[in-house]
From Swiss-Prot, chain A:
It comes from Haloferax volcanii (strain ATCC 29605 / DSM 3757 / JCM 8879 / NBRC 14742 / NCIMB 2012 / VKM B-1768 / DS2) (Halobacterium volcanii). NCBIfam families: thermosome_alpha (NF041082), thermosome_arch (TIGR02339), thermosome_beta (NF041083). This is Thermosome subunit 3. The gene is cct3. Keywords: ATP-binding, Chaperone, Nucleotide-binding, Stress response. CDD domains: cpn60.
From Swiss-Prot, chain B:
One of either CCT1 or CCT2 is required for growth. This is Thermosome subunit 2. It holds the Pfam family Cpn60_TCP1. It comes from Haloferax volcanii (strain ATCC 29605 / DSM 3757 / JCM 8879 / NBRC 14742 / NCIMB 2012 / VKM B-1768 / DS2). One of its GO terms (molecular function) is ATP-dependent protein folding chaperone. Molecular chaperone that assists in the folding or refolding of nascent or denatured proteins along with ATP hydrolysis. ATPase activity is highest in thermosome assemblies containing CCT1:CCT2, followed by assemblies containing CCT1:CCT2:CCT3. Seems to contribute to thermosome ATPase activity. Not required for growth. Belongs to the TCP-1 chaperonin family. Gene3D superfamilies: GroEL (3.50.7.10), GroEL-like equatorial domain (1.10.560.10), TCP-1-like chaperonin intermediate domain (3.30.260.10). The thermosome or CCT complex is a oligomeric complex of two octameric double-ring structures; the complex is probably a heterooligomer of CCT1, CCT2 and CCT3 with yet unknown stoichiometry.
Length: 524, 557
């Protein structure tokens, strides 16, 4: 083992930083814990927000774990693993990012104690993996046997939004909008849910209580020409993926003109080509045109003359939503325009908000896209509202599509911890200690919840366990200035099961990955 | 540093910045550098091996247990150390696994060589001895190896599991081993002479983050990470005719810059019409071929996209070249590089499914003579799946080589101890100082069980002694169970390695050690970093040709 001691020989490039053995483990674990520590105060209905200021002075105020970690400018490589965990959580299920990060941190903290007790890292890894398996079983058992009606989904959305800065609207109004939005577009003909169909658009001004659900698409666009109608009802819609402009050939072409007549002919030809677009659209009975590319000013004029409302440079994602809302096809050419290529909507109207005009496209024939139009006093308010709503949409979808719901408020975690402890006794070898440590780590979630609510964490935990023992269900319900132990289902605190599963999975994988490292080699 | 110049007034014949290290100093320098490399990876060896976290200058993080990945990412700046890294790379290319073992053995060989050098044994004698031993060791591996039936799935799974233990893929090794063995069996064909040929070109690995590793799956077919070019295209086909196209569906342009002068709008119109007609014609050719799905390696013009969508054809543009090649195997289609000469015969058949959440296409071949499977690996984060992929790739190589080679060995240090004991017997028959080198070689091989024990927190000497005793009793398969610390039949315990990887490890470790030993002079134009050029290192391989014949002497052992 002890190699011959000599002058150390450097085989690595100069400036390379290397730590190994216990010090590498310590440094990684400390970094992981520090990250978890940073977000834990945001957990739960009484969690607080963070204000993050970036290097250019931009301010973000948020309660959302993934956003905090992303903006925190974290450099330590192991800490980045935790950021990744919260990002995966965000991408997969859209919520529970703080939970995942806190759980990873707790798992690392307990791993540190186990390493002190001389448990080999691979044993800890085995134990944690085993415990995660038990946890998944426990989650299975906790899945509530209820029908996912609107009422229940609203509770799920509400649970996700509590503690976030949802402005002066109480969460229940927003939850109603969210659930309705998701239900309206939930499944298309193939039985597939497209998350993009629920769109969120924000606009400052008014108060957040002015938030509304638009059954269609809201575009941040103005008509290309002032003379176009500002509102059209019962309209035929075309969505174009082509330029309404003079066509140019792929080869460079150049007029070589010797007489005035030739010039006139060229100008006339262009003119009639441009008129042709407006005519083709008017003939097809189109009332509103959404174009993802440019529209020549002259064409805009002709369209206005024909009484057609047109928008140019519409974003691809907007065009997609418009197509899904109105049933229109996206056209790359007008030459073979057919009635079936066009869509229909009840109304298109331009509404002014401050200096901006927004186009509301409502009541589409296909009705496959809806927009949550969020209002709020300031930029920061709507931004945070948007994050909360996006998360709420995700959890509602997760509840419908990914296996149902479990009680929230720490109740599921208590059940997991209890199950792991009782099964731990049957596990042979040192692994058992790691399995038990996992139970402790999971309990850190209700503990943090209690702490943030203003309860004594130890008392709360003991009460929770006792109540779970007798009634099989116990969570932390915030009330007044503190909290109490209660039945979360009765009080409507419900989480999608997918969020819990993903948090357990990704926290375990990240923590075990970090525990296995005994050597960190960082290039300059 | 001990780069002392020769005493006396030096005669300077080199550039001012040049550095020169000679004789014992050079040997010492080289050996230490090589050992430092070996030292860096040895803690990753075995089921209780640990991982390394590597951070590059951009701040990108790699977490791995894979020897060759560690060495590649380590930013090594020393000419000798880089030669050792090459050992790992060769091992990876040839055998796909056992890179850590190869490097660790190379380091140990050099350590033992150092002792021999101290006893005034000339490097050429050591090299000859190492060569003899390596030759002999490979013969013995073939002798010890057990022939297996390539259809024995249980055994193949054990081989895959052994390769994965100690890596993060271990946590789901039953599932993954099953997937790997099934994948390899899908692409194995029996040649006329009864040997098995595995074409790993037909196994592709795709990774996806989200969900856990236990939800990884094996798909018969390809996973194409692309979107349709147009939203209105159909994306699900039970039975589609697939066209693979290596020609842009765009207006043809000359390579030379052309500039057309026209005089009237009619002329312009003709150009425009002609261009449109050209696109239309290309689309018509695709339609006429009967294709439902087009994977194009090049671009597709916007207007052509529109026409294709109208015809209800699914088109994907800028498909990766490797994907096209894979699709060719799966669908049985030929790649069309000129639409003018398209025939129905070149189309392949496949079912196409769309995974909206993952934005992927699953393409599955229809028919008997289609080969091609995709291992879809999942893990919670990028780093998890990356490491999973490395582990699975290695296991895949190992299983493939087992099927092709048909020989396996007991792992857990069993083979190394057995080899060492046989080499020691053989050493007695070697005359001259080479005998000592052969013995040193035997000692070096025993590094593997020693490190296995060390990484598991066991006493390495006790373990080694127990193992030696067991092998003395004729228990060829006796290996170390690192979980219990007991010596047991490794084969029965499911620790099975391929003979091919072991042979390669022995061979490349010896050659690298010999290469380093032969050097007695390092001349660097600048300082001794690899920013400058390498020194001389050409001599060693040539010296080995003559040694082959002698190895045969002890063959009947």
């Amino acid at each position: 083992m002890a190699s011959r001691m000599q002058q150390p020989l450097y085989i690595l490039a100069e400036g390379t930083n290397r730590t190994h053995g216990r010090s590498a483990q310590d440094s990684n674990i400390r970094a992981g814990k520090a990250v978890a520590e940073a977000v834990r105060t945001t957990l739960g209905p009484r969690g607080m927000d963070k204000m993050l200021v970036d290097s250019s002075g931009e301010v973000v105020i948020t309660n959302d774990g993934a956003t905090i970690l992303e903006k925190m400018d974290i450099e330590h490589p192991a800490a980045q693993m935790l950021v990744e965990v919260s990002q995966t959580q965000e991408e997969e299920v859209g919520d529970g990012t703080t939970t995942a990060a806190v759980l990873t941190g707790e798992l690392l903290a307990h791993a540190e104690d186990l390493l002190d007790d001389d448990l080999h890292p691979t044993v800890i890894v085995e134990g944690y993996t085993e415990a995660a398996r038990i946890a998944q079983d426990a989650i299975d058992d906790m899945v509530l046997d209820v029908t996912l009606d609107d009422d229940l989904l609203r509770k799920v959305a509400e649970s996700s939004m509590t503690g976030k800065g949802t402005g002066d609207v109480t969460a229940d109004v927003l939850a109603k909008h969210v659930v309705k939005a998701v239900q309206m577009v939930h499944e298309d003909d193939n039985g597939v849910f497209h998350r993009d169909d629920v769109r969120v658009l924000t606009r400052t001004g008014a108060s957040s209580s002015a938030t509304e659900l638009v059954e269609g698409v809201v575009l941040d666009k103005e008509p290309v020409n002032e003379n176009m109608p500002r509102s059209v009802s019962d309209a035929t819609v075309a969505v174009l993926d082509m330029k309404l402009d003079v066509r140019k050939s792929e080869v460079d072409t150049e007029y070589n003109i010797t007489s005035v007549d030739q010039l006139t002919a060229a100008i006339d030809a262009e003119d009639s080509e441009l008129r042709g677009y407006a005519k083709a659209l008017a003939d097809a009975g189109v009332d509103v045109v959404f174009c993802t590319k440019s529209i020549d000013d002259r064409v805009a004029g002709f369209l206005a003359d024909a009484g057609i409302l047109a928008f140019k440079s519409v974003k691809k994602s907007d065009a997609r939503a418009l197509a899904r809302a109105t049933g229109a096809k996206r056209l790359g050419s007008l030459s073979d325009l057919d009635e079936s290529d066009l869509g229909r909507v009840d109304a298109v109207s331009i509404r002014s908000f401050g200096d901006d005009d927004l186009a509301f496209v409502e009541g589409g024939a296909a009705a496959r896209a809806v927009t949550l139009f969020l209002r709020g006093g300031t930029e920061h308010v709507v931004d945070e509202l948007e994050r909360a709503i996006e998360d709420a949409v995700d959890v509602v979808v997760a509840a419908i599509d990914k296996g149902g719901v479990v009680p929230g408020a720490g109740a599921t975690e208590i059940a997991i911890a209890d199950r792991i402890r009782s099964e731990a006794a049957g596990i042979e070898g040192r692994k058992q200690l790691a399995v038990e440590a996992y139970a402790d780590a999971v309990e850190a979630l209700p503990r943090t919840l209690a702490e943030n609510t203003g309860m004594d964490p130890i008392d709360a935990l003991v009460d929770l366990r006792a109540r779970y023992e007798t009634e099989g269900l116990a969570g932390i319900i915030s009330s007044g200035r503190s909290g109490e132990i209660g039945d979360p289902v009765e009080l409507g605190v419900i989480d999608p099961v997918a969020v819990k599963r993903e948090a357990i999975e990704s926290a375990t994988e990240a923590a075990t990955m970090i525990v296995r490292i005994d050597d960190v080699i960082a290039a300059k | 540093m001990s780069q002392r110049m020769q005493q006396g007034q030096p005669m300077i014949i080199m550039g001012e910045d040049a550095q020169r290290v000679k004789d014992r100093d050079a040997q010492e320098y080289n050996i230490r550098a090589a050992r430092a490399v070996a030292e860096a990876v040895r803690s990753t060896l075995g089921p209780k091996g640990m991982d390394k976290m590597l951070v590059d200058s951009m701040g990108d993080v790699t977490i791995t247990n894979d020897g060759v990945t560690i060495l590649k990412e380590m930013d090594i700046d020393n000419p000798t150390a880089e030669m050792i890294v090459e050992v790992a790379e060769t091992q990876e290319d040839e055998a796909g696994d056992g890179t850590t073992t190869a490097v660790a053995i190379a380091g140990e060989l050099l350590k033992n060589a150092e002792d021999l050098l101290e006893q005034d044994i000339h490097p050429t004698a050591i090299i000859r001895g190492f060569n003899l031993a390596s030759e002999k060791a490979r013969e013995e591996i073939d002798d010890i190896a057990e022939r297996v039936d390539p259809d024995d799935e249980e055994l193949l799974k054990k081989v895959a599991e052994t390769s994965m233990t100690g890596k993060s893929s271990e946590l789901n090794k039953e599932l993954l081993a099953d997937l790997i063995v099934r994948a390899v069996r899908q692409v194995t064909v029996e040649a006329n002479d009864g040997s098995h040929v595995v074409d790993l070109e037909n196994v592709s690995i795709e990774t996806q983050t989200g969900r856990s590793a236990s939800e990884s799956e094996l798909l018969t077919g390809a996973v194409i990470d692309k979107d349709p070019v147009h939203d209105d295209m159909p994306v699900q086909f039970d039975e589609a005719d697939v066209l693979l196209l290596n020609e842009p569906v765009e207006v043809e342009e000359t390579d030379i810059d052309t500039n057309v002068s026209i005089e009237s709008p009619d002329q312009l119109q003709k150009f425009l019409d002609q261009e449109e007609a050209q696109l239309k014609q290309k689309v018509d050719q695709i339609v006429d071929s009967g294709a439902d799905v087009v994977f194009c390696q090049k671009g597709i013009d916007d207007l052509a996209q529109h026409y294709l969508a109208k015809q209800g054809i699914l088109a994907v543009r800028r498909t990766k070249k490797s994907d096209i090649r894979f699709l060719k195997n799966i669908t049985g289609a030929a790649v069309v590089s000129d639409l003018d000469s398209i025939e129905a015969a070149v189309l392949g058949r496949a079912s196409v499914r769309r995974d909206e959440a993952g934005e992927l296409f699953y393409v599955e071949g229809i028919g008997d003579d289609v080969h091609g499977v995709t291992l879809l690996l999942r893990g919670s984060t990028d780093h998890v799946v990356d490491e999973l992929e490395r582990g699975v790739q290695d296991a895949l190589d190992v299983v493939a080589s087992t099927v092709a080679d048909g020989r396996v060995l007991a792992g857990g240090g069993a083979i190394e101890v057995e080899l060492a004991s046989r080499l020691r017997n053989y050493a007695d028959s070697v005359s001259g100082r080479e005998q000592l080198a052969v013995e040193a070689y035997a000692d070096a091989l025993e590094l593997v069980p020693r490190v296995l024990a060390e990484n598991a927190g066991l006493d390495s000497i006790d373990t080694l002694v127990d193992l030696r005793a067991a092998h003395e009793d004729g228990q060829v398969r006796a290996g170390l169970n690192v979980f219990t610390g007991e010596v047991e039949d490794a084969f029965d315990a499911g620790v099975v390695e391929t003979a091919h990887a072991k042979e390669q490890a022995v061979a490349s470790a010896s050659e690298a050690a010999n290469l380093v030993l032969k050097i007695d002079d390092i001349i660097a134009a600048g300082d001794l970093s690899t920013g400058g050029d390498d020194d001389e290192e050409g001599g060693a391989p040539g010296g080995m040709g003559g040694m082959g014949g002698m190895g045969g002497m002890g063959g009947a052992m």
